[in-house]
């Protein structure tokens, strides 16, 4: 049984989840869903590690959504895991990131299971939305 805090957090993050879903991202909320996706998917995938922090709200989520709308070349798949909320799913996805340290929010572009581009939280916090969008568009152009 969950406590009041956990229920409050589940309700609070609904709009944060929906922002990426409305942009075409598939939520992976369990370890099994991550494994199923990663083991049965080919091509390129943009993974957004979502978060409740301000830089996720003001920069990461809107930048990811705009980049996939604006880019000429786009990843084959768009998925998201939610750090701090879907802990098992996030931990499982991070296993596929190899030696890259945990960072949330963050964005990873994968070819198959290989990370070919990664944007850490500190790169999101210190950037404008346009800089993040350009960063993603360039990664898409090179890898998709």
UniProtKB/Swiss-Prot annotation:
Q: List the disulfide bonds.
A: none
According to its UniProt entry, the protein's GO biological process terms are: cell redox homeostasis
The lineage's top-level taxon is Bacteria
* Family listed: Belongs to the bacilliredoxin family.
| Name of protein | Bacilliredoxin BC_2157
Species the sequence originates in: Bacillus cereus (strain ATCC 14579 / DSM 31 / CCUG 7414 / JCM 2152 / NBRC 15305 / NCIMB 9373 / NCTC 2599 / NRRL B-3711)
């Amino acid at each position: 049984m969950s406590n009041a805090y956990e229920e409050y957090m589940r309700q609070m993050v609904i709009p944060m989840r929906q922002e990426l879903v409305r942009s075409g991202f598939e939520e992976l909320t369990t370890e099994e869903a991550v494994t199923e996706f990663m083991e049965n998917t080919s091509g390129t995938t943009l993974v957004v590690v979502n978060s409740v922090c301000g830089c996720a709200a003001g920069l990461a989520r809107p930048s990811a959504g705009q980049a996939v709308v604006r880019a000429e070349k786009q990843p084959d798949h768009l998925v998201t895991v939610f750090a701090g909320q879907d802990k098992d799913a996030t931990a499982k996805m991070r296993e596929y990131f190899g030696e890259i340290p945990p960072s949330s929010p963050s964005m990873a572009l994968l070819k198959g299971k290989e990370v070919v581009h990664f944007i850490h939280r500190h790169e999101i916090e210190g950037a404008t939305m346009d800089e993040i969008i350009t960063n993603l568009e360039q990664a898409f152009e090179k890898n998709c």
